């Protein structure tokens, strides 16, 4: 084996099994999606500075524990038909209502979205298939982050919207 210097992020994909044990599913030298959205919501520091110092080999490992006190939850809103053939072109409304739910504690990350240009010159935000949006909420406790996240999920509308209703539930059982 050759020794290779690794300077990047390492994503560990975990799955909690039926017995409550965390199992490693995969390793990737990239950020996980949508897991990163939840991490970024509670990151207490400058992500660019952290990544730069890792890349040039000056990362102070004592700064890695720079996650703010709190918890986060991210729920993916997918287009109808996901994970198979998905709908496209459905107008997305009320994102602002979701983001305004709790000042600074709810973020909406775009994935499968597109702008549709109307003949009258107006534009509308539409689905573009697959994972459409990642709704992320943070709070002091996991229970409150999950509650806030699903409240925001209910405020965003588009035809065929689908999402899991159990995100974070296993974490609550562990706590």
Could you tell me what each predicted segment is?
Residues 1-5:
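Short, small-residue-biased leader/transition segments that mark boundaries at the very start
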Residues 6-17:
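A short glycine-rich, hydrophobically flanked beta-strand micro-motif that places a catalytic Asp/Glu
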Residues 10, 23-25, 131:
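Protein kinase-like catalytic core scaffold
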Residues 16-23, 27, 31:
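Interdomain hinge/lid region at the active-site interface
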Residues 28-40, 81-83, 114-116:
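Glycine-rich phosphate/pyrophosphate-binding beta-alpha loops
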Residues 53-175:
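Peripheral (often C-terminal) accessory segments that flank ATP-dependent C-N-forming ligase machineries
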